[in-house]
Amino acid sequence: MTRYFVDTNCLLGLTFINDRWYPDAKRLFDTDNTIYTGKNAVYEYCSSTGDNSRCSADIRLDRDEGLYGEKRAKLRLKLRQFGKMLQTYSDDELDIETVMDVYVDRFDMKESEEKEVRPRLQKYFEWYFEKEGELTRRTAREAARKLKDVLMERSIKHKDQIEARVYLEPMRDREYPDVEKRLKEWPVHMKNNADIALICDAVFLKEEIGISHFVTGDFTDIYSNQDWIHENLGFSVLYLLETFAGEEKPTAGLDLDD
């Protein structure tokens, strides 16, 4: 069975069903392979606060801070704003494209994110308005409220699944100054200390339990240096959106039935 190391984006991608990485992260986590992560990914994911550091934090997957807590707070705020913004339109002005444009605007989506997320969200709204038989200010407001409830509930459920599915042990207990030095020098020139820390976590797990793949959800220095990492550190780097891409099933909106 293959042993994967996943970064923070993979964890967030599975947690939030409106995340651009959700379909691909779900396919990864639905495999029979063993999935590991490291203390630095979990620090970012759910253990960082304004008062702790990577060295001082109590790093556990059952905590609710970090990017997980921040994204949940943002969801609550942005979806409330979304619902209120829809109420500024008359019933005659509302159509599915207008609803989606307001959502994209409220969430400040980048073009790349919009391309991934908008079609899935549009399926949800189309399903909801068809179920209600009309698209009005009332049904738009109710659809926004339902979406908020679903996203919040699923984020809790999926985080529980991550706690049960992902191994944080063994946790790195030593430093890799030589690896850090080589990553910062030519030809890699890696500048992001958080990425370097993630790689060192993966090096540790390569030594301890033989992880073979590092899965990342973003085009970072890690992915752009995949050949060097494979040749020198002994594990391959996989890009989540390429390796686990697939046909999305038609859905009543963001896996409402999962």
Language-model-detected regions and their locations in the chain:
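Acidic beta-strand-to-loop metal/phosphate-binding motif
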Residues: I211-D218
